[in-house]
Amino acid sequence: MADRKFNFCAGPSALPTEVLLQAQAELLDWRGKGLSIMEMSHRSDDFVAVAVEAERDFRELMSVPDNYKVLFVQGGAATQFASVPLNLLKLGAEADYIDTGIWSKKAIAEAGRYLKVNVAASAKDNGYACIPARSEWRLSESAGYVHYTPNETIGGVEFLDIPDVGDKPLVADMSSTILSRPVDISRFGVIYAGAQKNIGPAGLTLVIVREDLLGYASDSLPTMLNYKVASENDSMVNTPPTFSWYLAGLVFKWLKGKGGVQAMEAINCRKADKLYSYIDDSEFYANPIDLSCRSWMNVPFTLKDDRLDQKFLQEAEGAGLLNLQGHRSVGGMRASLYNALPEEAVDALIGFMQDFAGRNA
């Protein structure tokens, strides 16, 4: 579509144009039923079929083992900062958390309201530019689980491997990396992910939880946050965000049509490599993150003169490159390269950056 621009927003992020066109075509009359899917009962046979198919496709894409439940819940990933410790409280009154940036710090602060948090490793001392080596972690023997954030969207720091935490359940906030590459789900106890990066629109959160962890919830856990209750009710304890669930299902179909997460891994690696290579070769732009832990999904960068920041953003928008401003807490620029952002968007961004640098060096 000629009027579609390239959206580099960190979230809510770009959605596949093909998905939006299908949703548009079905908006008023879903598959000849005479009503929108937004108007349909979540307990109707038609919507239940949509929900079941979405879960089946997600399981196939992520190779989710049979002994894991997939939950479609509400509240965003931030709600999971409380849900995780409350659902796992009876594993132990202490948990290990790895601090690699703003989102892991938020998870630490919230969990600290319900149990003792041991910050087993922190990137604070290196300015959150590098993930602490596994040999530096100080895991607690009494911890019930270990939590980490594989990708920090604001700082642009990412774990490129799954950390080994022994027999402790590993919990991960995969909001910004889910579906971007294959993952060995069996290495985890719980994975959660807000939808608005690689899954679909905001309003939905996916939780993957190993079945044997469903019986460890706090007795005071609110019903709507209880993984076991959600599992027993097929994620429909109350009315779910049906439109977000439906759109997520369309995204899963789109991903399968593109070759699945294996194909996305190659594309995403290529997109990130292109942009980092240009930044590293440039004397006008810089990326502060250590080479060993640069994010594929979120690429922060600065200009050599920050007085040019607003000019850069204004001209980029005029060139059809949207939402490149860095997070308000760190400034600078940030290009988010989620699945739905095509490779030509990265090529267009690099072309603009070259032109801007040439005119403002």
Curated annotation (Swiss-Prot):
Gene3D superfamilies: Aspartate Aminotransferase, domain 1, Type I PLP-dependent aspartate aminotransferase-like (Major domain). Its main location: cytoplasm. The modification N6-(pyridoxal phosphate)lysine is found at residue 197. InterPro entries: Aminotrans_V_dom (IPR000192), Aminotrans_V_PyrdxlP_BS (IPR020578), Pser_aminoTfrase (IPR022278), PyrdxlP-dep_Trfase (IPR015424), PyrdxlP-dep_Trfase_major (IPR015421), PyrdxlP-dep_Trfase_small (IPR015422). It is found in: Cytoplasm. Disulfide bonds: none annotated. One of its GO terms (biological process) is L-serine biosynthetic process. Pyridoxal 5'-phosphate binds at residues 103, 153, 173, 196, 238-239. It catalyses: O-phospho-L-serine + 2-oxoglutarate = 3-phosphooxypyruvate + L-glutamate; 4-(phosphooxy)-L-threonine + 2-oxoglutarate = (R)-3-hydroxy-2-oxo-4-phosphooxybutanoate + L-glutamate. Pathway: Amino-acid biosynthesis; L-serine biosynthesis; L-serine from 3-phospho-D-glycerate: step 2/3; Cofactor biosynthesis; pyridoxine 5'-phosphate biosynthesis; pyridoxine 5'-phosphate from D-erythrose 4-phosphate: step 3/5. Keywords: Amino-acid biosynthesis, Aminotransferase, Cytoplasm, Pyridoxal phosphate, Pyridoxine biosynthesis, Serine biosynthesis, Transferase. It comes from the Bacteria. It is an enzyme of class 2 (transferase). L-glutamate binds at residue 43. Binds 1 pyridoxal phosphate per subunit. One of its GO terms (cellular component) is cytoplasm. Its EC number is 2.6.1.52. PANTHER family: PHOSPHOSERINE AMINOTRANSFERASE. NCBIfam families: PRK05355.1, serC_1. Catalyzes the reversible conversion of 3-phosphohydroxypyruvate to phosphoserine and of 3-hydroxy-2-oxo-4-phosphonooxybutanoate to phosphohydroxythreonine. Belongs to the class-V pyridoxal-phosphate-dependent aminotransferase family. SerC subfamily. Homodimer. This is Phosphoserine aminotransferase. It comes from Hahella chejuensis (strain KCTC 2396). The gene is serC.
